[in-house]
């Protein structure tokens, strides 16, 4: 929120396309803002079964921050393209609107990354918006899926471009197309730069995120 340049009264648009505009997700997000940040003006852009605002471009350009929900990145990007959202999002980005999101809401801005949108297995997704010229490996420390291994294998074989992986609780802050810093709400979590090594394998570099001071106690995120 601080990246908007405002301390209070930010105008935020929540975009839950990746979860099919789930009423449960919408209620959870709007309730969280109402409880924790009642000063924030929160709108919701739904696209099922038709857009919830008369002019998508005008509405999004009026926001300080666009927050994209996680879920199916394949469905998200397909629906966005049907409604002309990639062009609108680029216009917002170039106008200085902060673009944000987690999971699919992070992956969508990149070139691609592993996804379980097609089924239980992890498959390469290469149809991201590509605003950021990197791949993105989200949930890099998941125990129930081999996301770490899959992301690195896809980069090693050339299916995905070099990019950034993030363990849960880590965010990537870009300025333009340059990574400014990684931040985290989990002090032990890491981000990683991963690239092909030219010999059929990969090379990686650990990135130690800046811990967000107000959220540095891991106990806050248990349960």
Residue ranges and their predicted role:
Residues 1-8, 14-35, 65, 113-115, ...:
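C-terminal and late-domain segments of enzyme folds
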Residues 40-42, 99, 191:
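Hydrophobic anchor at the start of a short beta-strand
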Residues 71, 104-105, 170, 177:
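Alpha-helix/helix-capping structural signal
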Residues 10-11, 97:
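Residue-level recognition of the N-termini of beta-strands and the immediately preceding loop/turn
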Residues 13-14, 19-75, 79:
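Portal/gating segments that form or line small-molecule/metal binding sites
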Residues 44-45, 67-68, 99-102, 163-166:
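General beta-strand structural signal in soluble alpha/beta enzymes
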Residues 69, 75-145:
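Class I SAM-dependent methyltransferase SAM-binding "motif I" and its flanking Rossmann-like core
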